[in-house]
């Protein structure tokens, strides 16, 4: 049986000590903020109570349209933009991958923003540098949800967007069970959103856990990327096979039944790691997603990855 990703033992111990009053969680807040600023190369950062609250803060600061990808994003983008009564523009993508040139076809108002995830559907790295360059040249603010891309050793993700935000809930790369953050070089973002920030303040327990998890972010992301790459190399028809990702998506007309069978044969001790599509958060075509990002790092050994590959082959998903 596979193990679902949870906060590390050290993280849980620190959070427990903060909860019991053995150590002061408030002492960790500034340390967390400094680590986030260093990871994102951004001058200001705030810790929040959830990833969705980070999105709420970011979108609250935008006066123009909110541009969202047609798939491969996060459903909270649209839900929160609607709640804030923002005009939403849907951007055509290549199965989740953003081609900045497609924005030439859109009628976009001033002071608008594009919000997207570091990995399209978790399976394919976005060209964040090209996206940021296009948007900067056209007066569009970029908001990157780097929940799955924070700590990129190649410095391509979670660095160059105007606003970087993330969830730190399970089973994210920074995993403390809940919480999130938002970072930017534009101080006006935070001046405009003082009320949402007050309403989404995280607990001291989160500060303690996050401070510990931030120390392992780069290593944890790299382990996940390497495991995903290993599986992709052994399968012939994965989506965006040449891109880095933290899951593996395999298109198939009978995705629903195959996905069900895989769930029976690839069980975890908690939530699963098989997702079926169509699914806005992945791709809007029939497919099965193997959520490597959901697995505990101890499960990312070759023996376990070979078991996943074997079950995929047996299921005729290839």
What is each model feature region?
Residues 1-10, 280-318:
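PLP-dependent enzyme catalytic core of the Aspartate aminotransferase-like
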Residues 2-53, 71-79, 217, 228-229:
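Conserved N-terminal alpha-helix of the aminotransferase class I/II PLP-enzyme fold
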Residues 225-229, 239-266, 273-274, 278-288:
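Conserved glycine-rich beta-strand-loop-beta hairpin in the small C-terminal domain of fold type I
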Residues 145, 269-272:
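Glycine-centered flexible beta-alpha turn that most often forms the glycine-rich phosphate-binding loop
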Residues 173-236, 259-260, 266:
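Conserved core segment of the aminotransferase class I/II
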Residues 190, 254-263, 296-306:
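Short, conserved charged micro-motifs
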Residues 95-163, 170-173, 186-188:
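Active-site phosphate-binding strand-loop segment of PLP-dependent enzymes
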Residues 58-106:
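Conserved PLP-anchoring active-site segment centered on the Schiff-base-forming lysine
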């Amino acid at each position: 049986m596979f193990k679902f990703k949870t906060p590390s033992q050290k993280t849980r111990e620190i959070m427990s000590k903060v909860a019991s009053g053995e150590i002061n969680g408030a002492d960790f807040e500034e340390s967390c903020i400094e680590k986030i600023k260093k990871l994102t190369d951004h001058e200001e950062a705030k810790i929040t109570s959830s990833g969705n609250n980070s999105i709420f803060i970011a979108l609250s600061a935008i006066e123009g349209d909110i541009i969202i990808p047609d798939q491969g994003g996060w459903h909270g983008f649209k839900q929160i933009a609607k709640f804030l009564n923002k005009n939403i523009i849907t951007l055509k993508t290549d199965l989740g991958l953003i081609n900045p040139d497609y924005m030439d076809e859109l009628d976009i108002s001033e002071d608008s923003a594009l919000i997207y995830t570091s990995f399209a559907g978790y399976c394919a790295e976005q060209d964040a540098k090209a996206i940021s360059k296009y948007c900067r040249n056209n007066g569009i603010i970029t908001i990157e949800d780097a929940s799955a891309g924070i700590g990129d050793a190649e410095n391509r993700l979670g660095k160059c967007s105007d606003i970087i935000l993330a969830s730190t809930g399970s089973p994210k790369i920074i995993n403390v069970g809940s919480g999130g953050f938002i970072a930017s070089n534009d101080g006006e973002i935070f001046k405009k959103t003082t009320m949402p920030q007050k309403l989404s303040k995280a607990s001291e327990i989160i500060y303690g856990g996050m401070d510990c998890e931030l120390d392992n972010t780069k290593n944890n992301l790299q382990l996940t990327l390497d495991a995903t790459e290993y599986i992709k190399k052994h399968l012939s028809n994965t989506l965006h096979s040449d891109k880095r990702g933290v899951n593996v998506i395999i298109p198939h007309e009978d995705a629903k039944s195959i996905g069900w069978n895989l769930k029976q044969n690839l069980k975890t001790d908690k939530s699963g790691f098989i997702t079926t599509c169509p699914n806005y958060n992945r791709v809007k075509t029939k497919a099965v997603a193997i959520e490597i990002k959901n697995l505990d790092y101890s499960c990312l050994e070759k023996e376990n990855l070979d078991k996943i590959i074997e079950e995929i082959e047996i299921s005729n998903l290839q």
